[in-house]
């Protein structure tokens, strides 16, 4: 089920505080560290840099595009590494 229409989009209070500080003090080039992958990217985040935690590392995310607004931070930092499928054993054997 999706979120109720009467509720506002969820964004962790620490992210809102960091975004407001970055905009007010002019720290636009510094990356804001984000642990809350469930937080929604809001319109006031446009033009800022974020570092989203995937459980191991911080993945850099630049919010440059208008289409990123409304998506969640976790969508842009994958938690699993795809190593690829194994090759065909018959093709390598002679």
Swiss-Prot record:
Checking SUPFAM superfamilies in the record gives: Ribosomal protein S19
Could you give a single Gene Ontology term from the biological process aspect? ribosomal small subunit assembly
Mind listing the UniProt keywords for this protein, alphabetically?
Ribonucleoprotein, Ribosomal protein, RNA-binding, rRNA-binding
Q: Which residues form a coiled coil?
A: none
Superkingdom field: Bacteria
Q: Which NCBIfam families match?
A: rpsS_bact
Q: Which HAMAP family match?
A: Ribosomal_uS19
The record's comment on protein family reads: Belongs to the universal ribosomal protein uS19 family.
What function does the entry list?
Protein S19 forms a complex with S13 that binds strongly to the 16S ribosomal RNA.
Protein's UniProt name:
Small ribosomal subunit protein uS19
The lineage is:
Bacteria, Pseudomonadati, Pseudomonadota, Alphaproteobacteria, Rickettsiales
């Amino acid at each position: 089920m999706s979120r109720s229409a009467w509720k506002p989009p969820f964004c962790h209070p620490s992210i809102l505080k960091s975004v407001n500080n970055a905009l007010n003090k002019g720290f636009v080039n510094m990356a804001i560290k984000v642990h809350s992958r469930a937080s929604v990217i809001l319109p006031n985040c446009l033009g800022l840099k974020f570092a989203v935690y995937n459980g191991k590392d911080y993945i850099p995310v630049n919010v440059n595009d208008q289409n990123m607004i409304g998506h969640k931070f976790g969508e842009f930092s994958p938690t699993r590494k795809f190593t690829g499928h194994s090759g065909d054993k018959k093709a390598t054997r002679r």
